[in-house]
Design a protein with these regions (language model features):
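Terminal accessory/targeting
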Residues: 1-57, 72-81, 197-251
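Short, mixed-charge, low-aromatic patches
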Residues: 23-30, 50-56, 84-90, 143-149, ...
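Active-site beta->alpha N-cap acidic-glycine motif
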Residues: 30-120, 124-138, 236
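Catalytic domains of cell-wall/extracellular-matrix polysaccharide-remodeling enzymes
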Residues: 69, 91, 115-251
């Protein structure tokens, strides 16, 4: 019996030490597990705003055959947007890059080669960003200030490298899933259901039904008082913080 008590006491002591080290708090009859963890660095998923400004964005990597239709729809509805392009897309379609910027839209970096950025070293990450940034700026004559990680893949290292280069890392809070070749109606329904003031919508310039879905998105949202702006006009540039859900808020 004495041996059993000694073993039980040892186990209890070990558990107590573990809990204290891990940051576990004990509160009477229930144990509240609050493991202490370092705060993860996050990109901007959305912005806390009450003015009904939102942003629609298009990732550009593999083609351009629907880009004219996208631009026509935005011109018809007087909508501004942001394109995130990889370097090889901009170099393959320089006329589209110039056309996008010429119509008042944003053209920002989506990396040089579309890798999984979290798998790269710091030097490799910075090479991807500096090369693509320089290529876009050379072709368009417009400064690049935003970066969207390919595949939405990032870690603290990726975010830190982007920030050190003066780039705001951008994600999204509304995924249209247009890359799955959903119908225009289904794409629009997803967006309309999820959008709110300060939302950033993810789409792709080469989605099969993306261009067709735009009037179904623009019409209802504009009628409800929403305003589509470029992401660089949506986000706060200073005196801000990012909540754990990726929402950028003013301090």
């Amino acid at each position: 019996m004495a041996k059993t008590k000694r073993v039980a006491a040892f186990i209890l002591a070990a558990i107590t030490i573990f809990c204290l080290a891990a940051g576990v708090k004990y509160s009477g009859a229930y144990t509240l597990y609050t493991f202490a963890t370092a705060k993860r660095k996050l990109p901007i998923y959305s912005v806390e705003r009450e003015d009904k400004k939102i942003a629609i964005s298009f990732d550009c990597a593999w083609g351009a055959e629907y880009t004219d239709e996208l631009l026509s729809a935005m011109e018809k509805y007087n909508v501004k947007c942001t394109f995130f392009a990889v370097q090889f897309w901009v170099e393959k379609y320089p006329d589209y890059a110039k056309k996008i910027v010429g119509k008042g839209h944003g053209l920002e970096t989506h990396s040089k080669t579309h890798p999984k950025m979290s798998k790269l070293s710091r030097d490799e990450i910075k090479a991807e960003l500096t090369s693509s940034k320089a290529a876009i700026e050379k072709i368009t004559g417009r400064k690049v200030t935003l970066f969207r990680p390919p595949f939405g893949d990032y870690n603290d290292k990726v975010i830190t490298c982007a920030e050190e280069l003066g780039l705001y890392p951008i994600q999204w809070d509304v995924d249209s899933l247009d890359w799955k070749d959903l119908s225009a109606d289904k794409i629009a329904a997803r967006v309309l259901k999820r959008v709110k003031s300060g939302s950033i919508i993810l789409m792709h310039n080469n989605g099969l039904h993306t261009a067709e879905s735009l009037p179904l998105i623009f019409g209802p949202l504009l009628a409800n008082g929403y305003e589509f702006v470029r992401i660089d006009d949506l986000i706060y540039k200073e005196n801000y913080e990012i909540r754990s859900d990726g929402t950028q808020i003013k301090k």
